[in-house]
Amino acid sequence: MDLQTYIRSIPDFPKPGILFRDINPLLRNPAAMVEVMRRLGAICDAVQPDLIVGIESRGFIVGTPLALQRSLGFVPVRKPGKLPGAVIGVDYALEYGTDRLEIQSDALTGNPRVLVVDDLLATGGTAAATGSLVRAAGGELVGFAFVIELEPLGGRSALPDEVLAESLIRYP
C-alpha cells in the first residue's frame, strides 16, 4: 500500500511558504492505519522496546495503538504544565526562541528500553529533545519511528547516530 496517497499537502499552512503534510486522510482510513501499525510494528520488533514514548500530540495517535498492538506500556511526553505530579523537563531551541517538554519523573524507572514515536520528523528538534528527556528520566533510548519525514529539513542529523531512526513516508 502506498501510504503517501493518504497524505494531503496543504500549501501556505499554517503560514505562507509552508507546505503542510496532513495525516488526517490517513487517520480516517482504517486499511491505511492498519498498514501504518503493521510497519511501525516491524520497527518496534527490530528494537524490542519495553515502552513506547509518544510526543504530544500526534505521537499519541500512533504511539498508543502501537503500544497496545505489541502489549507494551505507553508514556506521553507533553508540553509544560500538562502532567500531574513530579516531572522532568528539557528545554530545546526553536527557530525563534525555545520550548520545553516534560515527562513524569517516575515514568521510566528501571531503565526500560524506549522507542520514541511521532507523526513527523522535520528539523529533529522535538525528537532529539525527547530522546534527551528519555535518557534523563532513566530510559534506554533504542529508536525513533515516524510516519512522515521531511528530508530537506535535515531532522535525521539531529538524532543520535547510534540509535535506529525509521520513517514510513519520506518526502525528498
From Swiss-Prot:
Any single biological process term in GO: purine ribonucleoside salvage
Q: What is its main location?
A: cytoplasm
**E.C. designation(s):** 2.4.2.7
The GO cellular component terms are: cytoplasm
Q: State its location(s).
A: Cytoplasm
Supply the HAMAP family for this chain.
Aden_phosphoribosyltr (MF_00004)
Protein name, as recorded: Adenine phosphoribosyltransferase
**Species of provenance:** Parasynechococcus marenigrum (strain WH8102)
